[in-house]
């Protein structure tokens, strides 16, 4: 069972996701968008378009409202990207159960973890291929 040891700091990055989980379908819609952004971040990076990312994260925070900030949105998205990368590095024996246990340890809400898990296994070969090409 190759669990991924995710850093404790992700719990702080995922605080916004806990708030979104409590918002029901609207919160899940934001989470799905965050997952798409994390996917893009893994495959193309974020540094090249940092100014665009900053505006996008700020706009998302405005739509979410409450205590959401551009920094909290950025932290959540990049935290999700970190999860995707670390799980891809875990290898082919990494299972859905391993994914769920690994993400539970850093406080990712169960419904969001299940969605991210399905997304990960749908795109795992893309992530592994990208890592192989970029991390020689």
Language-model segment annotations:
Residues 1-136:
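Positively charged, low-complexity terminal tracts
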């Amino acid at each position: 069972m190759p669990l991924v040891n995710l850093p404790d700091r992700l719990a702080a990055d995922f605080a916004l996701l806990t708030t979104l989980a409590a918002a029901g379908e609207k919160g899940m819609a934001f989470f799905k968008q965050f997952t798409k952004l994390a996917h893009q971040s893994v495959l193309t990076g974020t540094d090249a378009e940092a100014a665009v990312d900053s505006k996008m994260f700020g706009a998302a925070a405005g739509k979410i409202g409450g205590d959401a900030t551009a920094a909290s949105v950025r932290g959540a998205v990049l935290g999700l990207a970190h999860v995707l990368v670390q799980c891809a590095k875990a290898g082919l024996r990494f299972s859905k159960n391993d994914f769920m246990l690994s993400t539970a340890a850093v406080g990712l809400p169960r419904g969001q973890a299940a969605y991210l898990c399905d997304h990960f296994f749908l795109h795992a070969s893309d992530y592994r291929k990208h890592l192989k090409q970029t991390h020689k």
